[in-house]
Amino acid sequence: MLRYAVIFFIIALIAALFGFGGIAAGAAGIAKILFMIFVVLFVVSLFWGLVAGRG
């Protein structure tokens, strides 16, 4: 589960690069939305991995 958390975090960083860096100005809005989605998925996956690891 922590592997998925890291993958989501990396995807979120890439989305932030495109969204906040001005590289893809036309798709900045979409990239910002994707960034937030993947950050949420990262946090959920991280939490899930920590909780599942204790069981």
Swiss-Prot record:
Any one annotated GO CC term: plasma membrane
TM spans (from-to): 5-25, 33-53
Membrane topology: Multi-pass membrane protein
Protein name from the UniProt record: UPF0391 membrane protein RSp1666
Family that this chain belongs to: Belongs to the UPF0391 family.
Keyword hit for Transmembrane: yes
The keyword DNA-binding is assigned to this record: no
Subcellular location: Cell membrane
Pfam name, any one: DUF1328
UniProt keyword terms in alphabetical order: Cell membrane, Membrane, Plasmid, Transmembrane, Transmembrane helix
Top-level taxon of the source organism: Bacteria
InterPro entries, per database record: DUF1328
